[in-house]
Curated annotation (Swiss-Prot):
Its main location: membrane. Pfam families: ATP-synt_ab, ATP-synt_ab_C, ATP-synt_ab_N. This is ATP synthase subunit alpha. It comes from Citrifermentans bemidjiense (strain ATCC BAA-1014 / DSM 16622 / JCM 12645 / Bem) (Geobacter bemidjiensis). The keyword Cell membrane applies. The record marks 362 as: Required for activity. The keyword Electron transport does not apply. It is found in: Cell inner membrane. The lineage of its organism: Bacteria, Pseudomonadati, Thermodesulfobacteriota, Desulfuromonadia, Geobacterales.
Amino acid sequence: MEIKAEEISEIIRKQIKEYGTEVAVAETGTIISIGDGIARIHGLDKAMAGELLEFPGGITGMVLNLEEDNVGAAILGEFSEIKEGDSVKLTGKIVEVPVGPALIGRVVDAIGNPIDGLGPINTDTFGKVEVKAPGIVKRKSVHQPMQTGLKAIDSMVPIGRGQRELIIGDRQTGKTAVAIDTIINQKGGDVVCIYVAIGQKRSTVAQVVSKLKEHGAMDYTIVVAATASEPAPLQFIAPYTGVTMGEFFRDSGKHALIIYDDLSKQAVAYRQLSLLLRRPPGREAYPGDVFYLHSRLLERACKVSDDCGAGSLTALPVIETQAGDVSAYIPTNVISITDGQIYLESDLFYSGVRPAINVGLSVSRVGGSAQVKAMKQVAGTLRLALAQYREMAAFAQFGSDLDKATQMQLARGARLVEILKQPQYRPIPNEKQVLIIFAANNGFVDDYPIGSLGRYETELYAFFDSRKATLLGELRDKKAIDDAMKGEIIASLEEFKKEFTA
């Protein structure tokens, strides 16, 4: 066999040409201790706060503490396989999650990986989990209504697009029910909903998802789940993942609604992380920056100015209280950050008033300017009437001989309370809410026993749907009641009164 010099030189020339001169440089460190989802890493001198780290087995982490000789990081995932001595790589990136319309209808974990068994999410768009909230110039005051479909809220504690309205109450008082009803009520509208479940049982999350599917609400909803069995770092980061997904729609000029269920559990997860990172504890053993934990999250929900696309992100954070104590650390923090609160009371809940909203303690600081004019016209005196009724009812327990005016006020108040009750998963359109509240305020239900008012309401809606559809449509479109329409409504209610038998 003859070896030709030209062939050899050709092969060498070809090899030299194909030789890649790129050298991949990655800064790596070594794990010196690990446990409870926290790793301490030596040798990552160039790490940035919040930077994404790569652990063995494709697991990621996030830099939280930058100390003199080591870095404290939270592991975003299962850490049982990671051990001391393993090497960790810096990625040079801040933690990012997938965003965009491809996520709608999906259930994802705290870092955006699908967990619903429907295959991968096809999106090339990613958003940084930690970004600064929009500045003052980019914002606009809240002026469009965000309908919840719940009579008690839309009439007395109205919510606007871009508002942050806290839902607060003890366990088992219907906080999640209010949030889920609000999502269901957005059906057929232009709002994308994001439900973030933090520290809940998996069975509960599965139940919520199946209810949303049953009512066709998953068609415009994203569910982010960091359940009770997930490590604390994932429960801490889940709300930020959710708000990043919501910001995509807000910044595209669309409208989004995000529900954090609930932020008490996120605060507990963050307390766990902070104590393990040896940060000094403060009140109730929470770290000093637990206020900033929630304020930087909730400030990202806002109404954007017309120059920036006029989109909005509305937030409904949920906080669980212990035995009705709203003066605890986390509840007071979140009350001071949000634009109002819906306070749910267990006593009302158990006495059959559902949604169990305490009208005296619930308030919407900015929603009034966003309320539909027709609702403002009929529900203006509702809050005062109910507050007076509660006071009067408490006083009337001690005296039996009440004058006629007091008896009438008590009877009207009891009927108003009854009219504002509503079954779960049955949101009511705004124009129908206006009708029933108008009827109650103008004495059309005073002659009927309280027990028959549920039937009165159902039959009233059916009557207007079938025989007064034009009036209903007019009320829906005009969103205000003029004198002519008021006359028509009264005439229609009189007509219905003749037909309805208690």
